[in-house]
Amino acid sequence: MGLSEAEWQLVLHVWAKVEADLSGHGQEILIRLFKGHPETLEKFDKFKHLKSEAEMKASEDLKKHGHTVLTALGGILKKKGHHEAELKPLAQSHATKHKIPIKYLEFISDAIIHVLHSKHPSDFGADAQGAMTKALELFRKDIAAKYKELGFHG
C-alpha cells in the first residue's frame, strides 16, 4: 500500500500549493466536510452553532482550525509514510479526547481530494489524485491501528 517516490512527489507538489494558504484551504475543506456530513459538526463544540455556509465562512475559529488540521496533515505527508512520531499524539487526542471515528477521517479525506481538485485542477490531475488518495488511505490505516492499540474502535 506504500507509495512510490514518484507518487510522493505528486503529493508534495500539490501540497506546496496548499501551504501557500493553509487557512483558506483548511476552512474550505472543513466547510465541505460539515455540509456533506452534518453529523461531523457535532464533534466540534465551538462550531456546532454554525448552521449556514455563510456563518462558516465568517468564522475565524473555523479558519484557525482548518490551518491547524492542514499543518498537522502536511507534517505527516512530508514524512512519506514514516510518520509514526507525528501520528502517535494525533491518534491519542483523536481517539481518547475527541473520539473521532475513522469514518470521519474518510469523509475529510474525500473533502480534501475535492477541494484540491477544484482549487488546483492543473496540478491535481488523475495521477496526483490517485497518489493523494493512497497517501490519505495510508494515514487512515495507520491511525486506525493506533486507535486499536488505544482500545478505541471508532
Curated annotation (Swiss-Prot):
It comes from the Eukaryota. GO terms for molecular function: heme binding; metal ion binding; nitrite reductase activity; oxygen binding; oxygen carrier activity; peroxidase activity. The modification Phosphoserine is found at residue 4. Pfam families: Globin (PF00042). O2 binds at residue 65. The modification Phosphothreonine is found at residue 68. Gene3D superfamilies: 6.10.140.2100, 6.10.140.2110. Its EC number is 1.7.-.-, 1.11.1.-. Its main location: cytoplasm. Nitrite binds at residue 65. Residues 2-148 form the Globin domain. GO terms for cellular component: extracellular exosome; sarcoplasm. Heme b binds at residue 94. Disulfide bonds: none annotated. It catalyses: Fe(III)-heme b-[protein] + nitric oxide + H2O = Fe(II)-heme b-[protein] + nitrite + 2 H(+); H2O2 + AH2 = A + 2 H2O. Belongs to the globin family. Monomeric. Monomeric heme protein which primary function is to store oxygen and facilitate its diffusion within muscle tissues. Reversibly binds oxygen through a pentacoordinated heme iron and enables its timely and efficient release as needed during periods of heightened demand. Depending on the oxidative conditions of tissues and cells, and in addition to its ability to bind oxygen, it also has a nitrite reductase activity whereby it regulates the production of bioactive nitric oxide. This is Myoglobin. The gene is MB.
